[in-house]
UniProtKB/Swiss-Prot annotation:
It comes from Cereibacter sphaeroides (strain ATCC 17023 / DSM 158 / JCM 6121 / CCUG 31486 / LMG 2827 / NBRC 12203 / NCIMB 8253 / ATH 2.4.1.) (Rhodobacter sphaeroides). Residues 31-191 are periplasmic. This is Cytochrome c oxidase assembly protein CtaG. The gene is ctaG. The lineage of its organism: Bacteria, Pseudomonadati, Pseudomonadota, Alphaproteobacteria, Rhodobacterales. HAMAP family: CtaG. Residues 1-9 are cytoplasmic. The keyword Ligase does not apply.
Length: 191
């Protein structure tokens, strides 16, 4: 059985649409993986411990904080910058405050600039790894433990980095049913 030219064209178009649809679904996970592996777009690395090697060269790390439109929290770094040696572990704190009369959950997205530093800026522990839930009027200090990987000096672009900015943006997230129930329970008058 032979296909007519119209049937071949239609079959080819269906195949193209199917491949494009599959590629669009795979694009987001692939991009996220690519950014984690390469540090592209300022994506930081996650580490379990600091490196054994600490270099004499220092780098200035600046801290930035912002909120997504509609996020009611106040959010700020408790220090604006710090200098540390490459390979040395740093500890910085951010503060979040919920001025509302309701429990609010949020997650922090983050990035590092310049982009060349992203793959070498490693976090050991960070509030951004988990969702944060603040009760009405609650204020918390949230730590981030990090280091700059000594391998940065071997990178053709990274070796010129003298200042790195770590930026966080907090986004409001929906409370889980359990969190919402606890929030409602704590808001109920017990008299």
């Amino acid at each position: 059985m032979s296909l007519s030219p119209h049937q071949k064209t239609a079959g080819g178009l269906v195949l193209v649409v199917a491949v494009m649809g599959a590629a669009s679904f795979a694009a987001v996970p692939f991009y996220n993986w690519f950014c984690r592996v390469t540090g592209f777009a300022g994506t930081t690395a996650v580490a379990t411990e600091a490196p054994a090697e600490v270099l004499d060269r220092t780098v200035k790390v600046r801290f930035d904080a912002s909120r997504e439109a509609g996020m009611p929290w106040e959010f700020r770094p408790l220090q604006r910058e710090m200098k540390l040696k490459i390979g040395e572990t740093g500890l910085a704190f951010y503060e979040a405050y919920n001025p509302t009369d309701r429990t609010v959950a949020g997650t922090a997205s983050y990035n590092v600039t310049p982009d060349a530093a992203g793959g070498y800026f490693a976090k050991i522990a960070c509030f951004c790894f988990t969702e944060q839930v603040l009760a009405p009027g609650e204020r918390v200090e949230m730590p981030v433990t990090f280091y700059v990987d000594p391998a940065i000096i071997d990178d053709p672009d990274g070796r010129y980095v003298r200042q790195i900015t770590l930026s966080y943006t907090f986004h409001e997230t929906a409370l889980t049913e359990e969190q919402a129930a606890l929030a409602a329970e704590s808001a109920t008058d017990v008299n």
